Amino acid sequence: MTMAPPRTLAGFIDQVGGRAACLAVSRDPNAKVTILLFPPGTTRPAYVAKVPTTDAAARSVEREAEQLAEVGSRALGPVSTTIPKVVATVEHRGRPVLIMTAMPGQSMLAAYHSWRHTARRATVAADFSAAGGWLAGLHGAAAGSGQASLAQLLDGAADALSRRFGSQPDVDADLADLAGLRGRLARHRTPPTVVHGDFWPGNLLIERGRVLGVIDWESARLAGPPAGDLARFVTSYSLYLDRHTRPGRRVAGHPGLHAARWGAGVEYAIDGAGWSPDLARSFVMTGLERLGVPASCWRDVLLADVAAAAATADHDEFAWYQLTLFRRLTGRR
């Protein structure tokens, strides 16, 4: 925009002119409304407004604005064109609204849920290739000096699980498993890099096998262990493989996977056999080797992401499911 942005969301929308479209209303406790803004005569949005509906969501919006500003100040090479730029922070009903540049591309999640997309090796491999290529670009350009322990993948997880589930049975055993996992991860270090923090298919915008945009940076870290992004992509991609399959049925394209208990797709990726688990593990192993970490610790990295999700997920029910999944993966079924 050529003039200073106004102070309110309504004023910003008036200044842009054209059309406005509500893209999504989140169901999370930190729920936000996403609005696309189309200048007159355009077919693609130029701006995205993220509008919080609760005080918790407002803090999330402020955090994302801060992280995007910091990330935007780094020299990240070609990857920088795929990261939204902060245009302004305005106000709506007493809460901050983040205005960002809109990114091109279609959500990888939309393609993921299209007919038989995840049943075909070629399409799944293309998704992993696109995600891996983008992460290699980010982590390579943003690598700092020094070393970051992989144990940082579990920073705060034990305390969070104690607060969240301390009254539930067997949590002491969970914490013991977590301590052992943290100890194993502490043996390995990588150069610290910018970390997205929630690198799942719903946050990737793609076109023709390339990532054109990555959104939702509120969980970003400016100097963290990049292995977390590798793990989050695999666990989140695998989690929904059985979404369109009736309970008890075999999942199309995956002979070793049946739609059974929650998290079956993640168990399949980590402990199952077939082309899909092979792709998932290869994705993590290749990424770890690129970061200078032995590929053999791929399983611990994925376990750490499941535990971290149990500690940090917005929904208590989702967090509990992640914790029970962690128990199964650590042998306590």
Describe the role of every protein-language-model region.
Residues 94-107:
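Conserved short submotifs of the Hanks-type protein kinase catalytic core
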Residues 1-25, 306-333:
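Regulatory N- and C-terminal appendages and interdomain linkers associated
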Residues 24, 32-39, 43, 182-228:
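Active-site acidic catalytic loop and adjacent metal/ATP-binding pocket
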Residues 36-39, 51, 88, 102, ...:
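Conserved hydrophobic "DFG−1" position in protein kinase catalytic cores
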Residues 31-63:
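ATP-binding glycine-rich loop module of kinase domains
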Residues 5-19, 144-196:
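An alpha-helical support segment within catalytic cores of ATP-dependent transferases
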Residues 51-95, 115-137:
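A conserved alpha-helical element in kinase catalytic cores
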Residues 228-287, 305-317:
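Active-site activation/catalytic loop segments of kinase-like enzymes and analogous catalytic loops
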